[in-house]
């Protein structure tokens, strides 16, 4: 038995994978969603599902707030219960999580480093300098602190971090396969090449100390695009002859390159999975028509609520018009309805284009998929 529970996470991601083989069971939590996800949806889901009171693995794909906050809340809940000698919501066996310092390969405090870099840059008037510094530092400090808090909480709860890896969840020469009970995890990313690129962007930004008009833009480019795209933990899970691809906020081009380089594409240059977690909430900045024609699925899962225009119209059209190797009706699973979805459904008849849309019930905490 293999099930994927898609937890309502609004504009973020939160998934629970459940696998059973005889008396053996495996439960994996991937990402925790943004603010309020834990109290409103993840906690009730963990209480409702028969998970034997355990999470064999918790994975944080990357440190954006719409992925990490729910995990912070979960660990805080467990910590409070343990301190009060109360029954713990779940037992967490291990955590996969790449810290910001490891990603950037620095032992220096990033907040201090940034603060000092601002002191050497001409940002115009003191008022402009304070405004620019404040806006960037708020974003930076929040992200760094949340990543550090998760590491600190995990250590205080004695939860092993990345025990199967040399410090970081990372692909060096090729996808790393880890067998865990009845599930095989193939780590597709992040790659050493992409992390080297991210570190170079970071160091270049610090060294160049660009002037006012480019300073904020350059850093926000790294924060908003480079870090999610280049550092996302991307997993191909195989169990019960089924495949589920978790992409985080990774890049479609990177996924294709990895599959191609490792000889995983078929003779037609395609790769099929039973469930595809569509990258970056369906944003067209991370994917292309080529991606969906190369990587196709029976079920496409999009966790989004319209924020940042996700899922985008182009992404939906690319999925609907993509090649389908199985000739089965493809299913697109949405956690929420949005104006873009309504628009595309009006223009693309489901029967004519051989696809079906499934929406989470707004009164439910999660939707369950049984890949078949």
Predicted features and spans:
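Hydrophobic/aromatic beta-strand patches that form the interior of the parallel beta-sheet core
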Residues: 5-7, 28, 59, 96, ...
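Long, well-ordered mid-to-C-terminal structural blocks that present hydrophobic/aromatic surfaces
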Residues: 235-291, 296
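Active-site environment of divalent metal-dependent phosphoester hydrolases
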Residues: 11, 36, 63-69, 102-104, ...
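C-terminal regulatory/interaction regions
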Residues: 2, 13, 253, 257-265, ...
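Conserved beta-strand hairpin/beta-sheet module of binuclear metal-dependent hydrolase folds
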Residues: 1-54, 227-254
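Acidic/histidine-rich helix-loop elements
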Residues: 32-37, 83-84, 206, 285, ...
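Active-site metal-binding motif and surrounding structural segment of the metallo-beta-lactamase
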Residues: 25-26, 39-94, 265-285, 296-301
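Flexible, acidic/histidine-containing loops and adjacent segments that form or flank the divalent-metal
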Residues: 78-243, 329-337, 343-372
């Amino acid at each position: 038995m293999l099930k994927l529970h898609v937890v309502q996470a609004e504009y973020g991601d939160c998934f629970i994978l459940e696998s059973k083989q005889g008396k053996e069971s495996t439960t994996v939590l991937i990402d925790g969603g943004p603010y309020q996800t834990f109290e409103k949806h993840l906690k009730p889901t963990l209480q409702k599902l028969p998970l034997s009171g355990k999470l064999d693995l918790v994975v944080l794909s990357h440190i954006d707030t719409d992925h990490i906050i729910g995990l912070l809340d979960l660990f805080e809940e467990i910590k409070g219960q343990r301190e009060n000698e109360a029954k713990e919501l779940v037992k967490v066996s291990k955590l996969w999580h790449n810290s910001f310092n490891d990603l950037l390969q620095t032992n220096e405090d990033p907040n201090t480093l940034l603060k000092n870099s601002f002191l050497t840059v001409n940002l115009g008037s003191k008022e402009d300098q304070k405004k620019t510094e404040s806006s960037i530092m708020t974003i930076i400090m929040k992200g760094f602190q949340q990543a550090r808090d998760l590491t600190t909480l995990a250590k205080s709860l004695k939860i092993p971090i990345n025990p199967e890896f040399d410090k970081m969840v990372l692909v060096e020469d090729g996808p790393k396969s880890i067998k865990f009970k009845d599930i095989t995890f193939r780590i597709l990313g992040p790659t050493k090449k992409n992390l080297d690129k991210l570190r170079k962007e970071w160091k270049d930004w610090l060294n160049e100390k660009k002037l006012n008009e480019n300073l904020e833009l350059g850093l926000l480019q790294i924060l908003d695009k480079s870090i999610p795209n280049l550092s996302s933990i991307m997993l191909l899970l195989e169990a019960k002859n089924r495949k589920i691809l978790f992409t985080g906020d990774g890049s479609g081009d990177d996924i294709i390159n990895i599959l191609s380089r490792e000889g995983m594409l078929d003779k037609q240059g395609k790769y099929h999975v039973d469930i595809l977690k569509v990258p970056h909430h369906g944003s067209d900045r991370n994917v292309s028509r080529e991606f969906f024609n190369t990587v196709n699925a029976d079920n496409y899962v999009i966790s989004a609520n319209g924020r940042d225009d996700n899922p985008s119209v182009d992404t939906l059209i690319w999925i609907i018009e993509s090649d389908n190797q199985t000739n089965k009706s493809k299913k697109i699973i949405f956690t929420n309805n949005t104006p873009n979805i309504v628009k595309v459904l009006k223009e693309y008849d489901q029967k004519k284009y051989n696809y079906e849309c499934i929406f989470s019930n707004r009164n439910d905490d999660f939707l369950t998929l049984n890949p078949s």
